């Protein structure tokens, strides 16, 4: 926080956030300057865990998948997340099966229920993907391709070549 105003979010599984207790972890994260949590496998019904983080002014990032039913989306939104992260595809991250019709429909459903920002991620890796999604979403997350470029070229030359046209597509 000394050098940047960029929000910092802790991401892990529920088990990591409840041992020794959600209250303890929330306190420690808050003391360290974290702004929020993304708990990948946390059901919306776990109000006590969610409230432990909210009590320490830690924002919730809520994951919603293509298979999430409308009633569960409503439950997630009831938890008042700071941000909704829509998973754009079924399967594993980094695969090639974006269904733009399905993504558009689901994002429309989510935006009817909430005015919170919605970012999309999982499977997004090309300039074409970005061009197709940028008007549908409030933000785009590109993970696996960036991690791959960094691991193959620590000098970051390949990463720069990869990211520059994507940034241009977002700005266009």
Give the ranges of each region predicted by the language model:
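Glycine-enriched alpha-helix->loop->beta-strand junction motifs that scaffold or abut catalytic
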Residues: 29-35, 54-61, 78-84, 135-139
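Catalytic-face loop-and-helix region of soluble metabolic enzyme cores
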Residues: 87-97, 109-129, 141, 145, ...
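Conserved, mostly hydrophobic/aromatic
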Residues: 29, 76, 133, 143, ...
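Active-site-adjacent beta->alpha loops and helix N-cap segments on the catalytic face
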Residues: 1, 17-22, 39-56, 69-74, ...
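C-terminal helical cap(s) of enzyme catalytic domains, especially alpha/beta-barrels
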Residues: 145-172
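Catalytic cores of alpha/beta
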Residues: 23-24, 68-79, 120, 124-140
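Hydrophobic faces of well-ordered beta-strands that scaffold small-molecule active sites
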Residues: 8-12, 37-39, 59-64, 84-86, ...
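Active-site beta->alpha loop and helix N-cap motifs at the rims of alpha/beta catalytic domains
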Residues: 1-42, 136, 161, 168-170
